[in-house]
């Protein structure tokens, strides 16, 4: 039996006249592992929403053609039945968690199946162990980091024992160590015959764990190849906006049809880009935040140079998001104790300043940014940010929308856009506010390589105009290409700092993997790909 059978599919969202996806034929065999990739907004999420029955049952859209999942017609089969066969990990785990504690969340789906208590306990314990969250069992959901939350949601899906899994950007909010663990789980699922659909922008990460690559472009399947054909098709995939590492293009030009790491280590040279030194300190913060039980979540100092882009990396739960929230004044003081929160921006002491006052100097883009949207159109969202800070200008509004490729979406509701598009709306709104120091929590998450490059280039432009930017990210290649300095956090403290190439030479001990180009080019030693 096939996992997925699609014939003559057209999906048109309510209020739209043009189909979002048009697919003549697509088959996925039971037990097959398939990567679905493509630019942000290309139709990937729509396709998987059809496969798991979310469309048309939960999202109102017209579905023409035939779609069968393990022989079930998705048009007539309720999602409650489809979910017994197909489990889904959504791109934003925050939208998938409903319970108070981790163990309650993992048990929730199984409880709805009314299995025996003994069976439920076994499934929950096994799923938490697989996902490495057993130690979080009694933690409140709202205290988890993004990666911890993602593993919790995945455990809740696994506990339902589906025949197939759809993982929508499963590594987007997880640190490199967590990514390896999740992909090892994928390897385990494959060995057990579970059918897999991975939606992922970063092909390099998942290549060892898949059989096939499907590229969606403008709502259609543009490429459908076996994974061994990736070098042969490297130029085409690159032209479609996919992240094809430089060493793969090098192999293509050298006449290779397969990845040969031994050849690369002998012949491939890599030189990191030049960095900006900066013009002196613009931000200094000394922060101490602890739980009511006395455990320090943050106990560190941070300094940023004016006119630089600094990356902040570290394992999930190391304190990166908490540090940013402390700097901008967003710590929940009913839940946590702020022992010290000294913040100086451009010589002005903001330590006792309220949120609105800090907002004149500091702009903040949160990790889960949908909570920022309060207007019904993209244009009004960005305009509101400008007016709220007293910097509204019509020409500047148009410029910002063009910078972030949002001009065509002026009248769209931000919440109906793809995740990557919504993130660009949030970034445009943050930058439009006028502050000269910008703190971004995972702005690369969920973005395709094309838009990550655009983001990086625009951050460079902002840097060259005098802005100072701090970016929390797990994307080492983005850090290498677009940032000037790199900070690494561990257990609430900054433990490494310097230029990316300096820090990458020491970062493996802290769970930070440099881009593979560093190892292949002889800049560092890493046995992972030997």
UniProtKB/Swiss-Prot annotation:
Topology versus the membrane: Peripheral membrane protein
EC main group: translocase
Binding positions for ATP 2 per the UniProt entry: 314-321
Record localization: Cell membrane
Alphabetized GO MF terms: ATP binding; ATP hydrolysis activity; transmembrane transporter activity
Gene Ontology cellular-component terms listed: plasma membrane
Superkingdom field: Archaea
Signal peptide: none
Family: Belongs to the ABC transporter superfamily.
Protein name per Swiss-Prot or TrEMBL: Putative ABC transporter ATP-binding protein SSO1893
Source species: Saccharolobus solfataricus (strain ATCC 35092 / DSM 1617 / JCM 11322 / P2) (Sulfolobus solfataricus)
Lineage: Archaea, Thermoproteota, Thermoprotei, Sulfolobales, Sulfolobaceae
